[in-house]
């Protein structure tokens, strides 16, 4: 699979990435929130020992213990969508493993003992599901999962019971956000057992017009059914976004183009930038790239700036403590360097 951050596929507009997570627990062991720190570390060791005996995994996965990392390192992995807020919350006894391409992540002791994750670029649930299914099968041969004949996989949260599968697509919806139709969509898909959240999932806001669309219910539905249903809804939203963009360009052609190029100019010239400013300005430029208004910027550049200008990533790359203003100055420098050589 391709790392979504570094991909530059002209056909992949609107949908930045597809992700699937599986929640799994080990038989006979209390859920992570009931474990002592020492017991949680025992679970980490148990899982790692099992993984590193699997030939197909041991040479391609690197382990990270959150209790050995500084807080900024852990937050940096969150910003790259490789781990969750829940994992950081349990940092004293949690860990994760990632592959060399950063498309596979295995979180240990989040809400459940295991959260398996695969992520790739574009709307590509078929490939993502194939990858995570193979990973799950390999682990289940070496670890005994908590499973109930009627309920399916046992999870800490009842909404994950059954398949334990959560699929999500990260989508860029500037037109639907601008015309307020995103509110209608949110209300509509909630009734279909789906949800829309911000860039970093539950509890986060949709800065930069970036949303995560995911399923809410896993019990009583097959994996393929969940994925097919979600993919169908995402495709409908894509179509609505495209129609909204066409109407916007027809009615406000020069205003749209002005906003796009003005945003690019600010990104290239600003000396101080907040994280929210960058997300919103990048959204305008991304719209220009996706609509062919700007032709000399790769989407991979925008994706990397999206990640590298987040707070923890800046602090980690600078390798020193930064004041609020220093962070904003550093962010502007990163953006300027990322867009170096690109003409207005």
Swiss-Prot record:
PROSITE patterns: PHOSPHAGEN_KINASE, PHOSPHAGEN_KINASE_C. One of its GO terms (molecular function) is ATP binding. Its EC number is 2.7.14.1. One of its GO terms (cellular component) is extracellular space. One of its GO terms (biological process) is phosphocreatine biosynthetic process. Residues 14-244 form the Phosphagen kinase C-terminal domain. InterPro entries: Arg_Kinase (IPR023660), ATP-guanido_PTrfase (IPR000749), ATP-guanido_PTrfase_AS (IPR022415), ATP-guanido_PTrfase_cat (IPR022414), Gln_synth/guanido_kin_cat_dom (IPR014746). The keyword Transferase applies. ATP binds at residues 17-21, 81, 115, 166-170, 197-202. Keywords: ATP-binding, Kinase, Nucleotide-binding, Transferase. It catalyses: L-arginyl-[protein] + ATP = N(omega)-phospho-L-arginyl-[protein] + ADP + H(+). HAMAP family: Prot_Arg_kinase. Belongs to the ATP:guanido phosphotransferase family. Catalyzes the specific phosphorylation of arginine residues in proteins. This is Protein-arginine kinase. It comes from Clostridium novyi (strain NT).
